[in-house]
Each structure stands twice: as structure tokens, then as C-alpha cells.
Regions:
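A short, structured beta-strand/loop element
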Residues: 39-54
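Conserved Class I S-adenosyl-L-methionine
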Residues: 202-217
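N-terminal auxiliary segments of SAM/dcSAM-dependent transferases
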Residues: 4-42
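The AdoMet/dcAdoMet-binding core of the Class I SAM-like
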Residues: 35, 63-191, 195, 199-201, ...
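Short glycine-enriched, charge-decorated loop/helix-capping segments at active-site entrances
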Residues: 57-61
Length: 217
């Protein structure tokens, strides 16, 4: 069902006044952590994009700031008690934290290609991983291919990977979605975060329909 070498830079006093707490360039993107009032956000900055990837409300840490994140939780209407969850894309770690807090005995694997994002999530957003809430520094396609070989299945798969511009191209192909389908359990649910305003939206919708049939949009 669908529903590196790291180069860190010092933060100047001027940037501190603008609320920038951390800035570094990883192998994949430029990462900024900035704070406005009680809102702590991670931002990936590229030539064509300068949008927040993850935000945490320091006055209410368990509140999901973004509407899409709150909507993602509606996956539990279709599978109320998932035992294993796969999340592609870590950001500040708000989604794995939310599912972990809500579900007893759940095991969550979060795959993040950029080790710098993992480091920032732990240092600034206080994300913690353990045996039941793992974070794996790996390309999602490689991880899923290995999961197929090991016959690993997930009751809920969430595709939430962004590179600061849009979804990485190799995670938008029919071939990738067919691989994702193979790691879904019999009653498994797939949730994908896409932009309705993207010029690729119709292409994405057609690709998902080719693989999964009808879906909720």
C-alpha cells in the first residue's frame, strides 16, 4: 500500500547574531543549524534551495513542527502496530523519535547517506540511537538491496530523503520503488514525502502507480 570528508567552519560572531549555531560543508551539501526563538532548524543550502529540512520546537520537543511530518503519522491508521519501521532520511531525527515514543517494542532503522547529518542530529537535536532505534550511514539503495538479500521486511517504510534541492534522483526511479516493494511486509505501508508543486510531481505519481497501483494522495 502506498499512502566523506567533512569540512567544518567556525561560526563568526555576525552569524551568531543571525541565529546560526553551526555551519559545515559535507561531501553532499552545506549544512546549517540555526535558531529563531524556540525553533531549532537544520537547513541544507544549495544554489537553488535554502529551505529548512528539519525543525524542533525547544519549548515542546515532542511536537512535530512540519505538517507533512504530522501527516506521516497517519500511516498508523492503516497499520496500527508496526513492529519494524524503515525511514530513509534522518534530518534532525524527529520522525524516528516520534514513532519510537508512540509505539511499544517497535524497531526502527533510519538510513542516512551523510555522516555529517547524523553528527549534527545527535549534537544539536539530541537524537539518540540504540539497538531498537538504529541509524545507518549508507545510501538507501544499497541498504535496501542488502535487506532484500537478507529477506528483511518492514511493516512501514517512510521515504523522506532530500538533498536540499529535491529527492535524490536515484530514489525516484521505478527500479528503486520495485526494490522498496520487496522489503514491505504483507500488510506493509509505504509513505513518501513529495512536493505537489514540483515539476516532477506527475512523473512521480505515475511511477508510484505503475509499481503500487492506486494510492492515497
Amino acid at each position: 500500500m502506498l499512502l566523506p570528508l567533512l569540512v567544518a567552519s567556525m561560526v563568526s560572531p555576525a552569524k551568531e547574531r543571525l541565529g546560526i549555531l553551526h555551519e559545515e560543508r559535507s561531501l553532499y551539501t552545506r549544512i546549517l543549524v540555526h535558531k529563531v526563538n524556540d525553533l531549532l532548524c537544520m537547513k541544507f543550502t544549495l544554489v537553488r534551495s535554502d529551505s529548512n529540512q528539519s525543525c524542533k520546537d525547544l519549548s515542546a520537543p515532542k511536537r512535530l513542527v512540519f505538517a507533512y511530518a504530522r501527516m506521516t503519522m497517519s500511516a498508523l491508521l492503516f497499520n496500527r502496530h508496526p513492529q519494524k519501521i524503515l525511514i530513509v532520511g534522518l534530518g534532525g531525527g524527529t520522525l524516528p523519535e516520534a514513532f519510537f515514543d508512540l509505539l511499544d517494542n517497535v524497531k526502527i532503522d533510519t538510513v542516512e547517506i551523510d555522516p555529517a547529518v547524523i553528527k549534527v542530529a545527535k549534537e544539536y537535536f539530541l537524537f539518540e540511537d540504540d539497538e531498537r532505534k538504529r541509524v545507518i550511514a549508507q545510501d538507501a539503495r544499497v541498504f535496501i538491496k542488502r535487506a532484500i538479500l537478507q529477506s528483511t521486511e518492514y511493516d512501514l517504510v517512510i521515504l523522506d530523503a532530500f538533498n536540499g534541492d529535491y529527492i535524490p534522483e536515484h530514489l525516484m526511479t521505478k527500479e528503486f520503488l520495485l526494490e522498496v516493494q520487496k522489503v514491505l511486509s504483507r500488510d506493509g505501508v509505504l509513505v513518501a514525502n513529495t512536493f505537489g508543486t514540483s515539476k516532477l510531481y506527475d512523473y512521480e505519481s505515475n511511477t508510484y502507480q505503475d509499481v503500487f497501483g492506486s494510492f492515497i494522495n
